């Protein structure tokens, strides 16, 4: 299934930085932290996180920053998306040399000219040095689009999960709402192989703060908001909900699945 991904972060006031004074040594370049929001079409990429070969969103962004600064630049994302998954509001931060300080609203244009059309910077703001895109995040939102059309519209290819079988949207909504709250989501997690060993007690407990099901024509949108998610957790929950709507599985508390 394909989805969209967004991150909510704590609001931060603009940071303060001084430009280097004339004659100052360039041995250590003062840096300014910037919070960026990006949107991207995930189809051409192997996910967010950097990998050998450079075909990820992070790799493409870092090349754009490095080209602009003339020096290698590492960015830090608020979360990771899998291959083919899109984002409407992926937050990340970068540290820019003070020599490149420009008004915050000029950063999107400066970077977008160096990026492919499938990636766009939509917002930038200066933040204090203690801000971290991952650790300052207060919530994450994932949205999945399901097409119920008998024949998938070509323009939905790669953007919607095709499920033309008959199922009740009302029961789908009931199933999705069962995931609200704090539960043990072991049944909705795929192990990467890099989990801490032994796995700590409570590792699979997660809190979902909001769920929503909306229908527009032949499209159904499922939205989950939470403080954090396990690997492939949202994809597995989205896959289970229509099965409950079809009656192939019963509605149960997710902690007992």
Model-found features: residue ranges?
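Extreme N-terminal basic, low-complexity initiation segments
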Residues: 2-11
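Short, positively charged and aromatic/hydrophobic N-terminal segments
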Residues: 20, 24-27
């Amino acid at each position: 299934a394909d989805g969209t991904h967004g991150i909510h972060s704590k609001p931060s006031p603009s940071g303060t930085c001084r430009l280097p004074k004339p004659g100052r040594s360039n041995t250590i370049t003062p840096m300014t932290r910037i919070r960026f929001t990006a949107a991207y079409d995930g189809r051409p990429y192997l996910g967010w996180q950097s990998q050998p070969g450079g075909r990820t969103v992070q790799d493409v962004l870092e090349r754009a920053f490095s080209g602009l600064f003339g020096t290698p630049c590492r960015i830090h994302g608020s979360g990771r998306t899998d291959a083919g998954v899109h984002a409407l509001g992926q937050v990340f931060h970068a540290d820019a040399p003070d020599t490149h300080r420009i008004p915050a609203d000029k950063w999107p244009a400066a970077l977008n000219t160096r990026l492919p059309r499938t990636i766009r910077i939509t917002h930038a703001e200066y933040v204090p040095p203690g801000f971290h895109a991952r650790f300052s995040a207060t919530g994450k939102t994932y949205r999945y689009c399901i097409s119920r059309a008998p024949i998938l519209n070509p323009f939905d290819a790669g953007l919607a999960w095709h499920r033309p079988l008959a199922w009740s949207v009302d029961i789908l909504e009931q199933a999705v709402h069962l995931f609200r709250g704090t539960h043990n989501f072991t049944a909705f997690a795929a192990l990467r192989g890099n989990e801490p060993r032994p796995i700590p007690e409570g590792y699979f407990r997660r809190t979902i703060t909001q769920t929503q099901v909306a229908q527009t024509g032949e499209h159904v949108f499922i939205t989950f908001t939470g403080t954090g998610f396990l690997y492939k957790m949202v994809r597995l929950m989205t896959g289970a909900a229509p099965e409950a709507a079809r009656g192939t599985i019963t509605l149960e508390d997710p902690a007992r699945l």
